[in-house]
Structures are given as C-alpha cells and as structure tokens.
C-alpha cells in the first residue's frame, strides 16, 4: 500500500514538472518568433491541412499562439477544425459560414477562445498571481477587436507578466496584460 501511495505521489509531481516544462517551452517557442515574424497580415490565405501556416515573416496574433504550440506537436488548426465539426453550435457565427474552413477557423480569436473554454482550464482575469508563463490570454481592443497572446516568463519591475503577441508590428514581448479589456485566461 505504501509503495502505491509513493508511486501516485511521484506521478503527480512528475506531471506537474512536465506541465511546467511544456509551459516554458511554449514561451521559448513563442519568443523564437520575435525578430522573425516582423509583419502583420490578416489576409485570407489558402493553406495546407493539417499543419498549414502563412509565411513565417508575417501573420497575426493567433499565428504566434498556433506556431508556438506546433513546436510541441499540437496542431490547433486540426484540433479547432475537429472540435468545430463536433460542436458547431458552440462556436461563434460571426462570419456567416455554414461549415468549417481549415484555412481560417484556427486564425480567429473568438474560435480559439471557444476552443480553450471547452478544452483548457479557465483562470482568473484579475488575480495577478494566477498568470503563469505559457498561459493564453485574450482581450478586446478598441472597436471590440479580438486579440490573443502568451504570458511570458519575464515581468515588469512592478511584477506584471509580459505578453508575447503580434498586435501589428510583428511578434513582440510587451507589457500589455492589463492595457485592454481582458476576456479570457487559459492554461492548456
């Protein structure tokens, strides 16, 4: 019995360490896009499926998240498409589509918000201690424009986590966590 309890404790500790390692790897993979993804281009593009991408030198905020997860063999293009097919009624109908579109669905913040609400842990929007490196955060910018980013391992001198995102000038690591209206905070 004691051996079993020790084994369970070791497993829980190992899984916690693995999650932290994956979170830091996600941050590092997002940072790899800084000074590489230098533009912002929201144009609709045909792309491969699965694992399709726009050219690495450009993209939008969602592409930062998608690319970082791909380095961990997590294909949000495929996962969002599968989940939308399974739970079409759960996803927003903001674009007038009647079915899924593998070229764009995963590149839309409201779709990623829905996916993370369904499959990730939702966390506090106000408790500063709840924001950990690798967490995903979504906002609404002025004119209700959706935005998404990844919490960095770096913080401001005041202790506020920086965010890795692309808001128009390529992938950046910046102090924007509380600059806009926060909508979602997820750990996946």
Predicted features along the sequence, with ranges:
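Sec-dependent N-terminal signal peptides
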Residues: 4-13
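N-terminal signal peptide c-region/cleavage motif recognized by signal peptidases
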Residues: 14-18
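Soluble non-cytosolic domains of exported or imported proteins
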Residues: 20-25, 52-63, 106, 125-128, ...
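...with weaker cross-activation on analogous glycine-rich loops/strands in unrelated enzymes
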Residues: 22-27, 85-164
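Extracytoplasmic/secreted envelope proteins and their assembly/folding machinery
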Residues: 23-27, 31, 62, 66, ...
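Sec-exported extracytoplasmic/periplasmic mature domains
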Residues: 31, 35, 66-74, 81, ...
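Acidic helix-start/capping segments at beta-turn-to-alpha-helix junctions
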Residues: 42-62, 75-99
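Low-complexity, Gly/Ser/Thr/Pro-rich intrinsically disordered linker/tail segments
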Residues: 159-188
């Amino acid at each position: 019995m004691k051996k079993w309890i020790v084994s369970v404790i070791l497993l829980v500790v190992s899984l916690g360490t693995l999650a932290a390692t994956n979170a830091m790897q996600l941050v590092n993979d997002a940072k790899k896009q800084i000074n590489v993804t230098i533009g912002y281009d929201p144009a609709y593009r045909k792309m491969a499926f699965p694992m399709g991408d726009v050219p690495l030198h450009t993209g939008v905020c969602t592409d930062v998240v998608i690319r970082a997860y791909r380095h961990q063999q997590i294909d949000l293009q495929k996962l969002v498409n599968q989940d939308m097919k399974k739970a079409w009624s759960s996803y927003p109908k903001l674009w007038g589509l009647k079915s899924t579109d593998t070229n764009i669905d995963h590149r839309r913040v409201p779709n990623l918000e829905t996916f993370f609400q369904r499959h990730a842990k939702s966390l506090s929007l106000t408790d500063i201690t709840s924001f950990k490196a690798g967490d995903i955060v979504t906002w609404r910018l002025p004119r209700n424009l959706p935005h998404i980013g990844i919490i960095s391992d770096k913080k401001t001198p005041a202790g506020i986590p920086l965010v890795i995102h692309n808001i128009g000038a390529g992938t950046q690591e910046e102090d924007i966590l509380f600059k806009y209206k926060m909508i979602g905070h997820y750990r996946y």
